[in-house]
Structure formats: C-alpha cells, structure tokens
Regions:
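Patatin-like phospholipase
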Residues: 1-43, 51-393
Length: 393
C-alpha cells in the first residue's frame, strides 16, 4: 500500500497589535491538542508571534506578553507630561512619521535568532507592504536576504501612521495589514492543505478566505482591548480566552461566550435548564405578551449553543468572568452570585401572576434585565437541584 504523506497544516496568525496575546493562548491549546503545523504565516503581530512559535518559544512568548507594557513597545510621552510637553511630543511624532518602536525592536533582537528560525522544520511566511504604491509583499524566509529577518518582521508590524514606516535598503515598508491581515493565500501558496486561522479583528484589510481549504477559524466572542494598549492584565485575560476558544473550535468544550464542560453530566444539566427556562418563558409570555422583548433580546445575542444561550446571555449581562472553565452548574452558580438579586426579585410578580401593567411594561423596556430575571427564576425554582450561591466553582 502506498504511504500517504501527512496533511500539510498551516497556522495563520492575523495582525492586531496588543491583542496578539490572544494567539499565545491559542498556541497553548494547540500544543495540548497535539496539533502541530508544518507552515505558519502571519501579519504584523501575527508574524512576530509566529516567529516565536516556529522556534518553540512558548514560555518566552508567554512571559513576554505577561510583562510588557505600551512603554516597552514604543516611545510614549512621560505619564505626567504637561500640555506643552504633550503637544511637543505629538508634533515630533507627526514630523517623524509615527512613534519610535526601538523598544519593540530591542525585544525582537533579544528573542529571535535568525539562524535558528531558518533551520527550524516549520516553514514561515509574513506579509508587508511597500509604502510607495502600497505594493504588497508576501515573503517566505527563503525570500528574505540573510541578516534581514528581524527588519522584515518589524516592517510587517509597522502600523503606520501610528508607528513609523520601516526602511530596508532604501525602501519604506508598512504593516502587512494594509494588504492582507489574514494571510491564508500565502499559506496555500506555501503548500498548506488545512488551515487554522486566528483572527484578532484588528485594523486593516482582512480578505475573504478563497483558498477552498478546510479551515478552522478561531475568534474571540469578547473584546480583546485596544490594539496599541499593552497591559499584562489584559494579556493574561486574552491568553485564557484564546485557550478556551481553541478548545471550543476543536469540539473539546461547549458554550459560546463561556467555556463550559461538554461532558455527559454538564450536558444533561444544560438540557434540563433549557427545558425549564422555555417553560417559564412560555408561561410568562402567555400572561404578559409585552414581555416578548426578552425573547427578542435572546435571539439577538451572538450565541450558538441553544441550550446554554439564555444562561450565557444572562451571565454576560451580570458580568460573570469569561476566563474560567465552568460546568453548567458552576456557570449557573456564578450567575446567581453576580446578578443583582434585589432587581431580580422585583420581577417576581410576573412569575406569580400578580404583576401590574407597569411591571410588565418595565420588563418590556428592559429586555436584557428581564432575560436575567427569567434565568434567575428558572434556577431558583430548582431547574438544577442543589445549585446555590454557596456552591464552589
């Protein structure tokens, strides 16, 4: 029997500045899933992360993202600068064509070994753009002259006009996001047969994926922060989101906004919760049709897991932390702990049939809050026995 060559897998890393910490969480999950790419392509911060991934520098990447701040990446005005000093700084930035990124360049110089990158078994490619004429350049390591890999990585991340264009051999280059912020086409050109794409919803041009290749898209439900605000706490949060989103994309957990156990017990609880929720909602809707706005709010929520959708939407509105792993029960408990109980109890007459027209109208005017109340009543009416505010996570 003829031996079949393994599928050529590619990891495609989009640009997105400080949101790049999310990709480190994705990488952690891919390692746990034993998913190893033969090709990595990236734009901007995706290229910088991708180079570290090629070199198997997970701990280095993680520790870097957990310590850097904006001042470690680019030149900024003094924190306590007066208005005059701030104006002077801004004038200089405009005159010089963007902020100086020497601090970032020093990090890249310290972390990335060009010889090791070229010797690595994973093929690597990046995207940048020539400033003159906005000519796109898709470059593999073989296309980049010896000694210039760091220069081209910095060019791919030159987010002009906020950051300065990168000059290489007399040619000025800009961030690859000016051409292709998610270089799927480059991955296919390099021989990819299967893609995992990590989208940061950054600025720039994200072209449609026209490769025709099997593609797993990983994208956060949650906001990942400003693209030029580097902060360890945000980075830590983004890493957790990236980790769980990847496990979800590969079918290891369920949920949409939250990471929820997909095991038999948790799934049975999700089914029981949704059945009880639907019964409560149907009863209230028949008595007070005006409360249909809560159903509309649920339909508008970006939830793909139907059984968990009401609980996830309510948990989001109540401010439940999305960076933990939950079962259906512990997510319910977290919601009960986080919600405004006095506000929830104010809707009780709607569930007991003793509501006034004014209370029903209030529920209609506050569909998200009333959706929380529906979930709260469903849970406190023992849809999931033994779920209490004291149950540990």
């Amino acid at each position: 029997m003829e031996r079949r060559e393994p599928t050529q897998k590619a990891l495609v890393l989009a640009g997105g500045g400080a949101r790049g910490s999310y990709q480190v969480g994705v990488w952690r999950a891919l390692m746990e899933l034993d998913w190893h790419p033969q090709i990595i392509t990236g734009t901007s911060v995706g290229g910088l992360n991708g180079a570290m991934f090629v070199l198997d520098l997970y701990e280095t990447a993680r520790d870097m993202w957990l310590t850097i701040r904006s001042r470690d990446v680019m030149e900024l005005p003094e924190e306590n600068a007066d208005l005059s000093a701030l104006h002077q700084f801004l004038r200089r930035v405009v005159k010089e064509g963007g902020m100086d990124v020497t601090p970032l360049e020093e990090i890249v110089e310290r972390v990335l070994d060009e010889d090791a990158l070229r010797a690595a078994p994973i093929r690597f490619g990046i995207v940048t753009v020539e400033q003159r004429g906005l000519r796109p350049r898709e470059l593999t390591l073989e296309d980049i002259p010896a000694g210039q890999v760091r220069d081209y990585l910095m060019a791919s991340a030159a987010c002009f006009p906020a950051l300065r264009a990168r000059q290489i051999d007399g040619v000025k280059f800009l961030d690859g996001g000016y051409s292709d912020n998610m270089p799927t086409g480059l991955a296919k050109t390099m021989g990819a047969e299967e893609l995992v794409c990590v989208d940061l919803e950054g600025v720039g041009i994200t072209r449609p994926n026209l490769t025709g290749l099997p593609t797993t898209m990983i994208r956060s439900y949650w906001e990942l922060g400003d693209i030029l605000h580097f902060d360890p706490d945000t980075a830590k949060r983004n890493m957790e989101l990236g980790y769980y989103d990847t496990l979800r994309a590969f079918g290891r957990i369920r949920g949409c906004a939250y990471a929820v156990d997909s095991g038999a017990d948790s799934s049975a609880d999700a089914e029981a919760f949704r059945a009880a929720f639907d019964a409560v909602q149907k009863e209230v809707r028949e008595k007070y049709p005006v409360t249909l706005t809560a159903a509309a709010a649920l339909l508008l929520a970006r939830m793909k897991d139907a059984q968990l959708a009401p609980l996830e939407a309510a948990a989001e509105d109540a401010g439940v932390d999305p960076t933990h792993f939950y079962t259906t029960r512990t997510l319910a408990q977290a919601f009960l702990t986080a919600c405004d109980k006095e506000r929830m109890e104010s809707f009780t007459p709607l569930f007991t049939g003793s509501s006034t027209a004014g209370q029903a109208a209030l529920a209609a005017l506050l569909p998200n809050t009333f959706l929380q109340a529906l979930v709260w009543h469903t849970l406190t009416a023992s849809a999931l026995p033994e779920v209490t505010e004291d149950e540990g996570l």
